[in-house]
Swiss-Prot record:
Belongs to the class-I aminoacyl-tRNA synthetase family. Glutamate--tRNA ligase type 1 subfamily. A motif ('HIGH' region) lies at residues 10-20. CDD domains: GluRS_core (cd00808). This is Glutamate--tRNA ligase 1. It is found in: Cytoplasm. One of its GO terms (cellular component) is cytoplasm. The keyword Plastid does not apply. One of its GO terms (molecular function) is ATP binding. It catalyses: tRNA(Glu) + L-glutamate + ATP = L-glutamyl-tRNA(Glu) + AMP + diphosphate. Its EC number is 6.1.1.17. InterPro entries: aa-tRNA-synth_I_cd-bd, aa-tRNA-synth_I_codon-bd_sub2, aa-tRNA-synth_I_CS, aa_tRNA-synth_I_cd-bd_sf, Glu-tRNA-ligase_bac/mito, Glu/Gln-tRNA-synth, Glu/Gln-tRNA-synth_Ib_cat-dom, GluQ/Sye. ATP binds at K243.
Length: 447
């Protein structure tokens, strides 16, 4: 059986976002599920927009998610190989020179659209005589090159979409070499996939027409195309998610929002599939259950609050030995197991534990909370004597009810606000023993 080799090929022109991290995850998981290899390739032929800082950020995000790669390379290191294939395809008459300026091409596109026609290149340059081409060159025009798509039926079996058919007549011959001599994604990608023995490619369904063209490129180079799988798009309300829309970056989720790596990995590798989205604790366990056939053909809605809920489920499922290592990473190694167990059931983000440590160890500011001072002073007098334990809260509140007649929110909320300055949070039953007795009385009497 052929060894499975997948790849993730980001362009270092922006940050990783929830749309393309999904492709990275699924390619990695598919490779690991089948004991294969995963390759990281940087499509950096866009010299103007590609930046080292984006490449570094992409690698940082992948490492954060424990997406490790067996090989990595960038397309700029393979230009001589691309030139070799360019000459081969020119000899085969599958590439042809074009001399239209961007402005002329835009005029053609607008004209076609005004007539209700699809903006497909009209192949005007395909039939240029040598004399006409020479005239353009004398005018100072530099040619760009297009791949000649055969006008025939293109079909393949897609891992997600099933049987896919494309009419070659509906496809525009793509530009594969720009006028400045640089290569575009389309052909370089095929050459790389051939040379690195890529067997499976999982990517967004916005690449379906690219796949149809690239299948002809593989065949023009006498190579069997890889197996393709096209994921339905992730949408947020009414727009698809892409880096051009902005937001939803992985770096933002981990640095600013505070989502755990395995919450991100679990969520986006299961989103859009028939599998239940659960908080897996390791990439290996996630890979073991992974099934590419479980993914839907329909668009998938991404709601950030669902990710945050999964993050909460992951946090409360972690054993303290695992938590200890994560606490070190956020400079909160002073948190002990007792404190963690007391506050973790209500944590949405790991970093929230630092806030609760501060709440328990530093008197909160309650000046603007309009608290009932007489009630709180009365409650302070009724605080059980001796050591504060997890039983103290129920004993205390029963006594308050007996003396004041208060119940429910009227009883609990003023106490919570005076003690924590928060309307919600971990159960006060567990929080109360974390605050020194003298501090409890101070907070109640000075509110």
């Amino acid at each position: 059986m052929t060894k499975v080799i997948t790849r993730f090929a980001p362009s270092p022109t922006g940050m990783l976002h929830v749309g393309n991290i999904r492709a990275a995850l699924l390619n990695w998981l598919y490779a690991k599920k089948h004991n294969g290899q995963f390759i990281l390739r940087f499509d950096d032929t866009d010299l103007e927009r590609s930046k080292q800082e984006y490449k570094d950020a992409i690698e940082e995000d992948l490492k954060f998610l424990n997406i490790n790669w067996d090989q990595t390379f960038n397309q700029l290191s393979r230009l001589s190989r691309y030139d070799e294939i360019k000459n081969l395809l020119l000899d085969k008459k599958r590439l042809y020179a074009c001399y239209e300026t961007p402005e002329e091409l835009e005029l053609k596109r607008k004209f076609q659209l005004s007539k209700g026609l699809p903006p497909i290149y009209d192949r005007a340059s395909l039939n240029l005589t040598e004399e006409q081409a020479k005239k353009y060159i004398e005018q100072g025009r530099k040619p760009h090159y297009r791949f000649l798509v055969n006008h025939e039926l293109i079909n393949w079996h897609d891992m997600i979409k099933g049987e896919v058919k494309y009419d070659g007549k509906a496809l525009s011959d793509p530009i594969v070499i720009r006028a400045d001599g640089s290569m575009t994604y389309m052909l370089c990608s095929v050459i790389d996939d051939i040379d690195y023995d890529i067997t499976h490619i999982i990517r967004g369904e916005d690449h379906v027409s690219n796949t149809a063209i690239q299948i002809q490129m593989f065949e023009a180079l006498n190579t069997t195309p890889p197996t393709f799988g096209h994921l339905s798009l992730i949408i947020n309300k009414d727009e698809k998610i892409s880096k051009r829309v902005g937001g939803f970056e992985i770096a933002t989720l981990r640095k600013e929002v505070g989502i755990e790596a395995m919450a991100i990995a679990s969520f986006f590798s299961l989103l859009g599939s028939s599998a239940q989205i659960l908080p897996y604790k390791s990439m290996e366990k996630l890979a073991n259950q992974f099934e590419i056939s479980s993914f839907s053909k329909s668009p998938t809605i991404y709601q950030p609050e669902d990710l945050e809920r999964l993050n909460h489920k992951l946090l409360i499922s972690l054993d303290f030995d695992t938590v200890k290592e994560r606490l070190k990473e956020i400079n909160a190694e002073y948190i002990d197991e007792n404190f963690w167990l007391s506050v973790s059931p209500n944590l949405q983000k790991l970093r929230d534990v630092k806030d609760w440590w501060e709440i328990c160890h530093q008197t909160p500011n309650v000046e603007n909370l309009n608290l009932d001072k007489e009630y709180l002073k009365q409650a302070a007098e009724l605080l059980p004597k001796g050591e504060i334990t997890k039983d103290s809260w129920s004993i205390w509140t029963k006594e308050i009810t007996n003396i004041t007649g208060r119940k429910g929110k009227e009883l609990f909320l003023p106490l919570r606000l005076a003690l924590t300055a928060r309307e919600s949070g971990p159960e006060i039953t567990g929080v109360l023993p974390l605050i020194d007795r003298e501090e409890i009385i101070k907070r109640l009497t000075s509110a």
